[in-house]
Amino acid sequence: MALVQAHRARRLHAEAPDSGDQPPRRRVRQQPTRAAPAPARARRRRAPAPSPGGSGAPPTSGGSPASPLLDASSKDTPAAHRPPRGTVVAPRGCGLLQAIDAATNQPLEIRYHLDLARALTRLCEVNLQELPPDLTPRELQTMDSSHLRDVVIKLRPPRADIWTLGSRGVVVRSTVTPLEQPDGQGQAAEVEDHQPNPPGEGLKFPLCFLVRGRQVNLVQDVQPVHRCQYCARFYKSQHECSARRRDFYFHHINSHSSNWWREIQFFPIGSHPRTERLFVTYDVETYTWMGAFGKQLVPFMLVMKFGGDEPLVTAARDLAANLGWDRWEQDPLTFYCITPEKMAIGRQFRTFRDHLQMLMARDLWSSFVASNPHLADWALSEHGLSSPEELTYEELKKLPSIKGIPRFLELYIVGHNINGFDEIVLAAQVINNRSEVPGPFRITRNFMPRAGKILFNDVTFALPNPRSKKRTDFLLWEQGGCDDTDFKYQYLKVMVRDTFALTHTSLRKAAQAYALPVEKGCCAYQAVNQFYMLGSYRSEADGFPIQEYWKDREEFVLNRELWKKKGQDKYDIIKETLDYCALDVQVTAELVNKLRDSYASFVRDAVGLTDASFNVFQRPTISSNSHAIFRQIVFRAEQPARSNLGPDLLAPSHELYDYVRASIRGGRCYPTYLGILREPLYVYDICGMYASALTHPMPWGPPLNPYERALAARAWQQALDLQGCKIDYFDARLLPGVFTVDADPPDETQLDPLPPFCSRKGGRLCWTNERLRGEVATSVDLVTLHNRGWRVHLVPDERTTVFPEWRCVAREYVQLNIAAKERADRDKNQTLRSIAKLLSNALYGSFATKLDNKKIVFSDQMDAATLKGITAGQVNIKSSSFLETDNLSAEVMPAFQREYSPQQLALADSDAEESEDERAPTPFYSPPSGTPGHVAYTYKPITFLDAEEGDMCLHTLERVDPLVDNDRYPSHLASFVLAWTRAFVSEWSEFLYEEDRGTPLEDRPLKSVYGDTDSLFVTERGHRLMETRGKKRIKKHGGNLVFDPERPELTWLVECETVCGACGADAYSPESVFLAPKLYALKSLHCPSCGASSKGKLRAKGHAAEGLDYDTMVKCYLADAQGEDRQRFSTSRTSLKRTLASAQPGAHPFTVTQTTLTRTLRPWKDMTLARLDEHRLLPYSESRPNPRNEEICWIEMP
């Protein structure tokens, strides 16, 4: 027989016996009851004796009641009065809270009573005291935390401790001491022992309360406990924590580390298969106008061509005709506008773009209204609006039963190299999203200038998608496809795209790379510029521009012959410019179609994503497209069945983002020889260095928690302490990671000119042989340093990251591109080869993308979240810029003249609000001509700008929190890619310098003179060593470019870049000159096999290379070496200064000014190496320290 608590009465009833067994799945588990605490223990109330019938209810007159199963009247018995069945579960009297004391950071275990009134009453009974008469148990039962102090004052204990539970398990202790009573009442009369205290006297024992939100509990006891630092479990003596719990705590609970790694968001690479697209391809021609801010470039001609889906093309063509655009005679879909008037081109193009996006937006709105005929009645009944267009988006999405098939429209404004020039010139006119689109659209804008270019300028007009829902089956996503349910909105997107960002070359070279027809000839733009600036240009008798306007004599003759073939008597410079510009637009439009088809075919065939409707223009750059393909390949391989890439490939964020970025170190670029070198020189280049590095193992999996991380770090330190024993890069016992290290170099006779690591401690990146302190390095770098003889010590750092395993995560991506490139070479498919080469080289750059906390917005683009962040002090406005008013369309009111009488002028100083005389004469009137006593004032013209103040102001916003939130790029992969490239160069240095170990640096022969990121300039001795010791790394002798996990070893190849053009053998330069990094020249190339000679090579970064030659660079070096200060060498080139948003005075937003840059040509002055003699340079070392290093660090001497 079991006892159960009655529903309301404070008594227990006996349960009727039940002979049947309870089903196992419904059996109630009995919890052991805890003994009452000693201070609060009281006598239990015992249940009355059970009745003979076994029921707790009074027996009926008929004797024992019948069984409910047999008595039909029992169906009418209320459920509350039926005999309860089951096992008794006594309610818990106490709760347990484990928390951290905010004052001492001590873990605590707080045991508290769940029933405040009952516990406080029993506590008073145990201590032979009573509650104050004005404090009833009912008041205690309904009390919340706001009345706790009033209750304490009524109780008047000696002391009351209040533990308040805060966020994340932290408790704060406060002590309340009740005020003393007035005189005569503070002293209580003595009472006999074991007698209750007299009424009105305070309690004689302290109290302790726990506040959880608004709930108050009486604390039984507070005990200090221990807390595991790895899993956060509280324990008294010992405990066991699992690796899973440690990982969960580290990644999700710990307030310090839970935001260090973020899951990378994912969406399929393909676009919606029903997307309707319209492409407006355009180009502009400009002339130079001397404005208030220098030589500004003003457009005088704009040509555009339409392409895409036929219905949208037809609508755009008709709109252009209706707006007065001229049609080019050679193509019905090409229109143009020519006018030298400043701002006219931009105004007309803005009008067309506004009308076009308004036309497409209304088309989308019409289809939405047609699919929802109840919209008008609902808007009238619910909001009192006569037209649905007066609804807002927030109101529209509440429309019940939204129906229809969603539509997706995309408008692309495309050009070649427009983001760095054309769009900036036109931006002040065309950047506008205030078109008269219907009100229910949700309008968002993505505007991002970067490095002087407009990277994004996209506007989205969105409506609710009735078919949107959360995806649960991800099979379609694994194949790169998507459908109606994956989009929250149906939309019209207006996007600006630059084909230069997808080809990284000029339009002429891009046309050749993608097998497009290219027209011969070019235009004399200098003559056109002079024509618009001065009204004329120098020409021959037939009007053809003279030779000085062309690049050289050859270009002049070619273009003159091409024009003569047209049979025209007089050269029309404007018409010729129009034809050249229109032909450029035709080539760009063909390039757009070629890129769309070629990339879609590549993704479908080479990558194997047959369900992906890939559109390369959906993303603005080749880097973003390569990263999207990589994410899609990873998602297909891992099948995470979620909207991210899963827990195995994460992105470093917050503190870890800066920590990982510190391990990303740039390439090697410096000469170890300055001056003229008169001995054979060969140039070797690593074949696809970043592609080969990407195929090597990368860190994989969620980073280890601190406990497992410490074990992995100890294994690394034990391996590093074994001096003289080389570590295998692919030792499975050593896990990948990023560490903070100290490293000491070996003896200087064991060093060489190719250090294994570089440092920024001196403010500039230096490849140095000095000791390293506090550097952030990958585990690959640890092996490289150790194998080169360095002593490496791991510095304890809570940010140290160790991953659970290696994985060739990017190998499949690189293999696809290499296979496509080889297939393109066999099939002579230049387009496929260009795509594969670009994608192969772009992935590393996407990993290394640097994020910041800044963004640039227009005043009218700041949403509610941004404004809230500014008011809360979380976002600062770093600078504000205003658009140049000359670039805005304006209306000018002409000058006018008004006359005033003396009486009217007397009102000039009066307050308008003081005059209530409605019969007073108006101050403006036109008196008869020649009226005496009147004064005439002539008002200057007034300019009314056609723009809102929000359209004219750009704000640069920056978050106050300097930590970067990253959920897009796995930046640590970039660290390991660069680390593998350093391992390649380290092995290369072994081929050249291992035989010199033990010989002083000054006594060693010259083997290399210049090192670039992926190349090395070697002498004849170095060339022989490459052909012998490094033979397996030379491509012509065979070898692999892709890492093989079955046979793990460093995989990289080089080839000689200086080859003979006649026989293909390795050639050398007999004489060379080196002035500075990226400033050198090879006089010529000589082939030792066939004796042929060819043109050398010249590199002059930042200089106009066409104005330099080998002899000039030799003269420059000799003049500097001989101290001839009077003789100066320089180069000049025309540069375009682009300003998008700047706080600098004189730099106005959205302007392009033309300037002439003059740069002095001279040898390297601010060197990052130490001089060994007149020509030779060496990396810094302990005997030749870096003079820039001023950082102080603690070093313990042995």
Swiss-Prot record:
GO biological process terms, semicolon-separated: DNA-templated DNA replication; viral DNA genome replication
Residue numbers spanned by region Disordered: 1-87, 179-199, 904-930
GO cellular component, one term: host cell nucleus
Domain of life: Viruses
EC number(s) from the headed UniProt entry: 2.7.7.7
Function: Eukaryotic-type DNA polymerase involved in viral genomic replication. DNA synthesis is protein primed, and acts in a strand displacement replication. Assembles in complex with viral pTP, DBP, host NFIA and host POU2F1/OCT1 on viral origin of replication. The polymerase covalently transfers dCMP onto pTP, thereby initiating complementary strand synthesis.
Compositionally biased spans, kind Low complexity: 30-40, 57-68
Name of the protein in its database record: DNA polymerase
Subunit annotation: Heterodimer with the terminal protein; this heterodimer binds to bp 9 to 18 of the genome. Forms a complex with viral pTP, DBP and hosts NFIA and POU2F1/OCT1 for initiation of replication.
One Pfam family this sequence matches: DNA_pol_B_2
SMART domains listed in its UniProt record: POLBc
Classification lineage: Viruses, Varidnaviria, Bamfordvirae, Preplasmiviricota, Tectiliviricetes
Additional notes on this entry: This DNA polymerase requires a protein as a primer.
